[in-house]
Amino acid sequence: MQPTDSNHSHHLAWLVGAMALLGLFLLGLDQSLLFDVDEGAFTEATREMLVSQDWGHTTLNGIDRFDKPIGVYWFQAICVAIFGLNEFAFRLPSALSGWLASLALARFAQKEWGGHAAVMAAIVSATSLGPWAMARTATADALLGLFFVLIFLDLWRSLENNHAWAGQRVALWVGLGFLVKGPVALVVPVGTLLIYWLFAPAYRLRIKLLILNLRSWLVFAVVALPWYVYAYLRHGRHFIEGFLLKHNVERFMGSMEGHSGHWAYFLIALPLLWLPWSALWLRALGNFKTHWENPFLKYCWIWFLFVFVFFTLANTKLPHYLLYAGPAMCFIIAYSSLHASRLTWILTWLLALLGLSILIMGPSYLHDYPEWVSDPYYKALLEGSPQTDMKVWIFALPLIIYVAPAFIFFLRLSKIANLKVKTSYLFFTLALYQSLVLSMVTLPWWSRTLQAPAHDLAMMFKEDQRVVVQWGVHLPSFATYRQQESPRREPMPGELALVKNIQPYWPPDWEILAVHGPLSIVKSPEIAKTNP
């Protein structure tokens, strides 16, 4: 075969692989209802922005919303304008972000360590439980994850090769991240650079030049600051207090919405977020000293450790905060796989099968034993959950034995990896199997279990033009599906209210219009007319 033919075949294989990966990210995107609170809040804010045509500000049920910057709402609104008001459109920006992040990681890994590492980086990014979940969630986190990947890669290119253009691209990505999520997009790379300056003396001059580059700061300012200036001019101190202080400073200094945790919180979350690949990270941890001698791996570990320590010190703790270390984790795991022993792969298989078994069998047991849950609201939801035979997918695992050879044959044919059969190729099929089952079976079950009452009541009253408030509940997806605002307050005379019915807290003379599981729609009586 001529070199040009070989290159053409190679590029075609990468195109096919990229399209297959896109299919994986789009798989089941519309199979699950929107999850409250986060997905409901983001999607309702986007819907209200489209209705008002006010593209510079968001509201939630008519109240100013300062939780996140404007960027994610723009992306969601564009997709909704194209594909309609549905779960697929709301989640599409996250899915595309996960896909592009995986491709960027694969491209870098291919140049750094070869074709096998490229496939590893892409599959790890696409199938690990945490990144997989974020790519199917209509929030800002997958978009921020994409920008963190691009920041991570271009930051290293700038340090390693002293590329001025790469440094300015970093400023662009940081600006976009700032527009999507806020100051954390700047804190993580700057914090990583400062620590790398301490441990890598050879790079100190380049780090200094990168941080003090006025052109890069200008790029950042042009991208990120116009909306912030507009928001401040429009809302004044309310924007400062609502966004910068409450949703940034207070998240670090105090616990918001009950999301606190022990200092060891992320030690528990870490192996769960990176299933089924967690054992490879544990092996990398054992080789930390060897990795530290490699400048790029040192950079990966410093990025990871900064994220881990910074958010461990924060009082508000959420699992997805650890995903800000995503690009570093993907490369650490990919590199570890290149040198993994047979024993390491056996442990990886065992831990992955254990994790997948719990994820698949958990719903069946919770359905059969809802008394395991103490919260009466969630206990009632589980009691009304759909019957599931999900555990049958555990017994389908042997199918991997038949699917794996076809996957290996594709890799050989495409010349993406060398011709030698590697143990990791067999494990790819388990990772893909996990994504398939979770996307098409497990996640839809959880969405019906947790969200069906709110969704079905919203659809029941969608054509009803009367005001329906949320009283004693916070389920913003109810407003998204009903396509009408649903303020959180006590109902006024004659208004309807979405309430929890486990322990009724409304007066006995109120009319109950509909009941679905632990939720009801009730109507407050009109003000009685008095005789003159």
Indicate residue ranges for each PLM-predicted region.
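Membrane-integral, polyisoprenol-dependent glycosyltransferases
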Residues: 1-344, 363, 514-522
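Membrane-embedded architecture of ER/inner-membrane glycosylation machinery
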Residues: 2, 10, 168, 287-532
